[in-house]
């Protein structure tokens, strides 16, 4: 019974061992990383600007929908 339970574990361990080491990752090019930082910051700034510019319009739409709901809201009398 123990052999039957240990057999799948043994198979998995053997597969892991025969797979070998993982391939090494290439070293990153530091110079290109530093060259891309200004572009990344500019893109981030533009995205942030677009997001903040859309906030007033989204707030206006939300408040308008609340005002419409309140206009049609009636308190039931007891």
From Swiss-Prot:
Residues 1-26 form the signal peptide. GO terms for cellular component: high-density lipoprotein particle; very-low-density lipoprotein particle. It is found in: Secreted. GO terms for biological process: lipid transport; lipoprotein metabolic process; negative regulation of cholesterol transport; negative regulation of lipid catabolic process; negative regulation of very-low-density lipoprotein particle clearance; triglyceride metabolic process; very-low-density lipoprotein particle clearance. Keywords: Lipid transport, Secreted, Signal, Transport, VLDL. GO terms for molecular function: fatty acid binding; phospholipase inhibitor activity. The keyword Transport applies. It comes from the Eukaryota. Inhibitor of lipoprotein binding to the low density lipoprotein (LDL) receptor, LDL receptor-related protein, and very low density lipoprotein (VLDL) receptor. Associates with high density lipoproteins (HDL) and the triacylglycerol-rich lipoproteins in the plasma and makes up about 10% of the protein of the VLDL and 2% of that of HDL. Appears to interfere directly with fatty acid uptake and is also the major plasma inhibitor of cholesteryl ester transfer protein (CETP). Binds free fatty acids and reduces their intracellular esterification. Belongs to the apolipoprotein C1 family. This is Apolipoprotein C-I. It comes from Panthera tigris altaica.
């Amino acid at each position: 019974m123990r052999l039957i339970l240990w057999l799948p574990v043994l198979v998995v361990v053997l597969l892991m061992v025969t797979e070998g080491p993982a391939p090494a990752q290439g070293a990153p090019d530091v110079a290109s990383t530093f060259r891309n930082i200004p572009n990344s910051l500019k893109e981030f700034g533009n995205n942030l600007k677009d997001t903040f510019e859309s906030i007033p319009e989204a707030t206006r739409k939300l408040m308008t929908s609340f005002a419409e709901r309140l206009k049609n809201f009636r308190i039931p009398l007891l």
